[in-house]
């Protein structure tokens, strides 16, 4: 009876409390003795993380700026594409009307007819000049290697003097706007000549910009 009282009485409670206190003190001492992170290293790591985030954000903003500038430029360049095609059709009709007049009629034309012909020619030139001011450029394919991206082959012309598939005749002029083809040139290409050299060629746009 006396032994049980000793084990479970106030002395046992005090012993447990002392053990808990000792464990707490040991744990506190261990935490104090553990190496603490260096404040300077923590600051460097934080600065490095912030710098990476800033660089990523700056790159994203630069990409957004470039994309926006490109989209604005394209919108300005290509917004008139449909209108330009319609104007080219009108220009084609003016040219057909002029070409339909026989040379002898032009030579023998009176003042009224001559004035009319000159007026049509001036209108055609003014229209093409206005289109050019808005970025529409005429393609000059004669002598170039046939390129389906810019040319539409209408017929072949036997010609042993020029490389095969060289553009030798233009039936209808082609035009570009910006870096796009507004209308391919309708052309005749040579056949029967030497094989074209397998060399890398510049695009029509590169040649115009050179």
Swiss-Prot record:
One of its GO terms (molecular function) is unfolded protein binding. GO terms for cellular component: cytoplasm. It is found in: Cytoplasm. Keywords: Chaperone, Cytoplasm, Stress response. It comes from the Bacteria. InterPro entries: GrpE, GrpE_coiled_coil, GrpE_head. One of its GO terms (biological process) is protein folding. Homodimer. PANTHER family: GRPE PROTEIN, GRPE PROTEIN HOMOLOG, MITOCHONDRIAL. Participates actively in the response to hyperosmotic and heat shock by preventing the aggregation of stress-denatured proteins, in association with DnaK and GrpE. It is the nucleotide exchange factor for DnaK and may function as a thermosensor. Unfolded proteins bind initially to DnaJ; upon interaction with the DnaJ-bound protein, DnaK hydrolyzes its bound ATP, resulting in the formation of a stable complex. GrpE releases ADP from DnaK; ATP binding to DnaK triggers the release of the substrate protein, thus completing the reaction cycle. Belongs to the GrpE family. This is Protein GrpE. The lineage of its organism: Bacteria, Pseudomonadati, Pseudomonadota, Alphaproteobacteria, Hyphomicrobiales. The gene is grpE.
